[in-house]
């Protein structure tokens, strides 16, 4: 099974991806996580350091694939999850899709691409150009990390459009949304009512999820020394269990930009109006 994880920049895709990878490994699967971001920090919480990228390694070998060995590019991280960082082209030049293609090509040359039960692509931000949509060419399922906010859902809608487009020519489905670090899901529910997409999980608004990134550890590793965090692991294990059932998924029908803007902005305005009414009612009560 091949998964591609997308979402708005800064929403917590890499943190979510790493914990899902470990959850899948805990279920007995052999997992490879491929970071598809020029920052090459997708697997940082798994390995504890920034591993060399595929592109850096190929450049050092003058692009002689026959001189590259698996141990040059594949690093084992926490929980037995293997890690690869694709890297990216120089700033302002090249195409990220080409880099992803070269990564897959090299892994196939090394006979590594088909050795894993699960390959998870953790993809740069909410970029949905043809280049960074390239991992969708290889994926069975796409997951979108979001929160209960306007910007994240707007990005999710654009990514859903990319999934629909790729699904025309590839056996790709959208597995669902993962809401990261939120106490509410009312705006998410409003969106999925109009654009039916499964919600796989709603992760709690827990500061330790954000701090884990700074510590360079996954929540699974942190929980070994902080037992109070053990309850959070069940959220990721639940996502893993749903994915392992090979869900039907959906080919989404995204909303038009103006339609989505109207839907989400009306939701906020209605909340503000309702809040104003409630304040007035309370004030009248006290005046009486």
From Swiss-Prot:
Keyword Chloroplast attributed: yes
Recorded GO molecular functions are:
4 iron, 4 sulfur cluster binding; ATP binding; metal ion binding; oxidoreductase activity, acting on iron-sulfur proteins as donors; oxidoreductase activity, acting on the CH-CH group of donors, iron-sulfur protein as acceptor
Q: Which cofactor does it need?
A: [4Fe-4S] cluster
Binding of [4Fe-4S] cluster, residues: 95, 129
InterPro entries with a match to the protein in the record = NifH/chlL_CS (IPR030655), NifH/frxC (IPR000392), P-loop_NTPase (IPR027417), Protochlorophyllide_ATP-bd (IPR005971)
Q: In what pathway does it function?
A: Porphyrin-containing compound metabolism; chlorophyll biosynthesis (light-independent)
For biological process, the GO terms are: light-independent chlorophyll biosynthetic process; photosynthesis, dark reaction
The residues the record assigns to binding Mg(2+) are: 14
Q: What is its main location?
A: plastid
Cellular location(s): Plastid, Chloroplast
Record-linked Pfam families: Fer4_NifH
Q: What is its EC number?
A: 1.3.7.7
The UniProt keyword set, sorted, is: 4Fe-4S, ATP-binding, Chlorophyll biosynthesis, Chloroplast, Iron, Iron-sulfur, Magnesium, Metal-binding, Nucleotide-binding, Oxidoreductase, Photosynthesis, Plastid
Per UniProt, where does ATP bind?
Answer: 10-15, 39, 180-181, 204-206
- Reaction(s) catalysed (UniProt annotation): chlorophyllide a + oxidized 2[4Fe-4S]-[ferredoxin] + 2 ADP + 2 phosphate = protochlorophyllide a + reduced 2[4Fe-4S]-[ferredoxin] + 2 ATP + 2 H2O
Keyword set includes Metal-binding = yes
Q: Name any GO cellular component annotation.
A: chloroplast
The cofactor note from the UniProt entry for this protein is: Binds 1 [4Fe-4S] cluster per dimer.
- Superkingdom, taxonomy of origin: Eukaryota
Oligomeric state and interaction partners are given as:
Homodimer. Protochlorophyllide reductase is composed of three subunits; ChlL, ChlN and ChlB.
Protein family membership? Belongs to the NifH/BchL/ChlL family.
What's its job?
A: Component of the dark-operative protochlorophyllide reductase (DPOR) that uses Mg-ATP and reduced ferredoxin to reduce ring D of protochlorophyllide (Pchlide) to form chlorophyllide a (Chlide). This reaction is light-independent. The L component serves as a unique electron donor to the NB-component of the complex, and binds Mg-ATP.
The UniProt entry, under NCBIfam families, shows: DPOR_bchL
Indicate what this protein is called per its UniProt record: Light-independent protochlorophyllide reductase iron-sulfur ATP-binding protein
Per the UniProt record, the source organism is Stigeoclonium helveticum (Green alga)
């Amino acid at each position: 099974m091949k998964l591609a994880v997308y979402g708005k920049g800064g929403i917590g895709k890499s943190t979510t991806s790493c914990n899902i990878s470990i959850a899948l490994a805990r279920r007995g699967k052999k997992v490879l996580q491929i970071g598809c971001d020029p920052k090459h920090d997708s697997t940082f919480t798994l390995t504890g350091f920034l591993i060399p990228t595929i592109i850096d390694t190929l450049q050092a070998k003058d692009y002689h694939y026959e001189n590259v060995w698996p141990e040059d590019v594949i690093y084992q991280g926490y929980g037995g999850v293997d890690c690869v960082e694709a890297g990216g082209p120089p700033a302002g030049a090249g195409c990220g899709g080409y880099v992803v293609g070269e990564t897959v090509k090299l892994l196939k040359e090394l006979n590594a691409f088909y050795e894993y039960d699960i390959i998870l692509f953790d993809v740069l931000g909410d970029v949905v150009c043809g280049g960074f949509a390239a991992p969708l060419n290889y994926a069975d399922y796409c997951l979108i990390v979001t929160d209960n906010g306007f910007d994240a859902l707007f990005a999710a809608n654009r990514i859903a459009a990319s999934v629909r487009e790729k699904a025309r020519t590839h056996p790709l489905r959208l597995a669902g949304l993962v809401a990261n670090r939120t106490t509410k899901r009312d705006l998410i529910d409003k969106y999925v009512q109009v654009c039916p997409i499964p919600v796989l999980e709603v992760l709690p608004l827990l500061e330790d999820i954000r701090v884990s990134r700074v510590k360079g550890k996954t929540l699974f590793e942190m929980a070994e020394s902080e037992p109070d965090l053990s309850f959070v692991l069940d959220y990721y294990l639940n996502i893993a269990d749903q994915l392992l059932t090979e869900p039907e998924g959906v080919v989404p029908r995204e909303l038009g930009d103006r339609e989505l803007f109207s839907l989400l902005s009306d939701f906020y305005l209605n909340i503000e109006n309702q809040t104003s009414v409630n304040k007035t009612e309370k004030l009248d009560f006290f005046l009486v």
